[in-house]
Amino acid sequence: MYIAPADATLGEAEWRPFVEATGFGHLVAAGRNRDVPVVVPTQFLLEGDTIRLHLVRANPLFAALAENRRVLLSVAGDWAFIPSAWKTIGVEDPELGIPTTYYAAVQLTGTATVHDERHEPGGVADVLRRQLQALQPDIAVADPAVAHPRQIQSILGITIAVDSVSAKFKYGGNVDEAHRLAVVDHLQARQGPGDAAAAGHVVRRLAPRPPDTSNPRPH
């Protein structure tokens, strides 16, 4: 995706919490010599540099993975439409404002490994356990390998070793602080879906912060 300099991520400390909190995205597998890639909406778990998820065995994604294990997970959210008049302040003509959409988007690229209980006992169950522990840590569940042996045969686990991250946070970084704060006021007043999250990103990205000294993957 195209990332303007003003929208570039501030680093892993910014994109990782967004990806972990969202927890849902679209997994894209190009396969080989296909007219279009296979795209699957899915829940996922990001642990370190590894993505874990599971899909029904009949999912067409697995045919694409058999051709090419390289995949991309696209995660987007916290979006809000910004009307043209919101982009102007003071004596500026509201009719000349340029509307836009604020949003966050992260693309994680890596190599997928498929786990099949028929050939790797415990592989799918491990993915399920990790996902459930993250999604409902306070709710006890039976061990899937023991309680649901037949059902677990109908799904396959996927782990993705992430080696590249591209992240974009489009929240008015191309305009000055006064114009961005004016948009925040409008978002807080409108209180529509996504408005609070978008306003939070604008304010957070205005705050001065030390440079990211971690060892983030390419983005």
Name each region found by the language model.
Residues 1-52:
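An N-terminal domain-cap segment
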